[in-house]
Amino acid sequence: MQKKRIWTNARLATMAAGLPGLGIVEDGLIAAEGDRITFAGLASDFPYTEGPSTQGYEVTDCGGRWILPGLIDCHTHLVWAGSRADEFERRLAGASYEEIARSGGGIRSTVSAVRAASEAELVAESLPRLNALIGEGVTTIEIKSGYGLNIEDELKQLRAARALGEVRPIDVETTLLAAHTLPPEYEGRADAYIDLVCNEIIPAAAQAGLASAVDAFCETIGFTPEQTGRVLSAARHHGLAVKLHADQLSNLQGGALAARHNALSADHLEYLDEAGIAAMAQAGMVAVMLPGAYYVLRETHPPPLEGLRRAGVSLAISTDCNPGTSPLTSILLAMNMGATLFRMTVEECLLGTTRHAARALGLEKATGTLEAGKLCNLSIWDIDRPAELVNAMGLNPLHTRVWRGQ
């Protein structure tokens, strides 16, 4: 028999699309059976007559606290080995991201460490980062590969990411990012490496069921639009969703390229142009903001938020947790950065880590809002108003986190 639970005396920010703003319900109640929400709304509308305790429910009095959906970190590179703190010092001394990458640092530095690590070592090194995000109410996380750059080590990274979801109460969505950078053994042979990605790595990941999506780094220090298009086409051929690191450091028309391949999202987007915005809007894509990388790289060209808003493109926000350009393990701080650096509104930040983040992962039917039929993923907060989650820095007001009803 499935466990039945009720959370009463709560204020809800349901994030439901059918309600204005954050979908606030002041005198709210949530009921769940097993891992699914069966009711979320006004307590007075809940259909019982003799009191929930007499109907086999376990009742939790929330004491007037706020309940939001469990938070979603929809773009991370959380599984890695080694440290790139030395690059932080180099950037402080004036080196650019491109200079570090071209000198053999950056992603390639992490590739060497990941290739040398076992799957168990990757899990052990990644757990503290995952624990930090879980501690801030995250119940769903996307984790990319991209530090193996060959069949064996890309699959090893994906297995480690999946293993994290087996040892912690969290839903892990895995994304293959083999087209992250050119491995050293393919120096000067980018097209040959893309052949490997398309003809061997993507099919292997799909056959093993280790990835639900494929990503690529379309950039001057990554891969050309033509090479990226090949990767996205191969992903589609093997039944995988696609997303894209696009227009972060330059305008290569990455947003429009992602739209042509019906991507779930395009991410970063600092140099996205009007044509890219229009293409993304027409394709119904999500624009994922990653202010952590913008902050660490001390960029000065923010994403075109006003254009995205005018076009009706949904905005998500994520930590981009990675060892070099965004070693950020706080979804709350990511929201603050999005508001401060990009001028995102509180509503955009909160929807961007719930409903719109779910859409960026293709999970909008399962999670991201407090609605009947959705997974019972909740975050319960000691706050007076939801804006505090975006405003405060260094304070974690999480009271309780509920994952799949538990």
Curated annotation (Swiss-Prot):
Pfam families associated with the record: Amidohydro_1
Function statement: Catalyzes the hydrolytic cleavage of the carbon-nitrogen bond in imidazolone-5-propanoate to yield N-formimidoyl-L-glutamate. It is the third step in the universal histidine degradation pathway.
MF-aspect GO terms: imidazolonepropionase activity; iron ion binding; zinc ion binding
Reaction catalysis annotation: 4-imidazolone-5-propanoate + H2O = N-formimidoyl-L-glutamate
Protein name, UniProt field: Imidazolonepropionase
EC code(s) of this entry: 3.5.2.7
Gene3D superfamilies per UniProt: Metal-dependent hydrolases (3.20.20.140), Urease, subunit C, domain 1 (2.30.40.10)
Alphabetical list of CDD domains matching this protein: Imidazolone-5PH
GO CC annotations, alphabetized: cytoplasm
Localisation: Cytoplasm
Keywords: Cytoplasm, Histidine metabolism, Hydrolase, Iron, Metal-binding, Zinc
Metabolic or biological pathway, per its Swiss-Prot or TrEMBL entry: Amino-acid degradation; L-histidine degradation into L-glutamate; N-formimidoyl-L-glutamate from L-histidine: step 3/3
Top-rank lineage group of the source organism: Bacteria
Residues that bind 4-imidazolone-5-propanoate: R84, Y147, H180, Q248, T325
GO biological process: L-histidine catabolic process to glutamate and formamide; L-histidine catabolic process to glutamate and formate
Record carries keyword Hydrolase: yes
Family from the record: Belongs to the metallo-dependent hydrolases superfamily. HutI family.
Record: residues binding Zn(2+): H75, H77, H245, D320
Organism: Hyphomonas neptunium (strain ATCC 15444)
Cofactor binding note of this UniProt entry: Binds 1 zinc or iron ion per subunit.
Annotated residues for binding of Fe(3+): H75, H77, H245, D320
InterPro entries referenced in this protein's UniProt entry, alphabetically: Amidohydro-rel, HutI, Metal-dep_hydrolase_composite, Metal_Hydrolase
Annotated binding of N-formimidoyl-L-glutamate, by residue: Y147, N322, G324
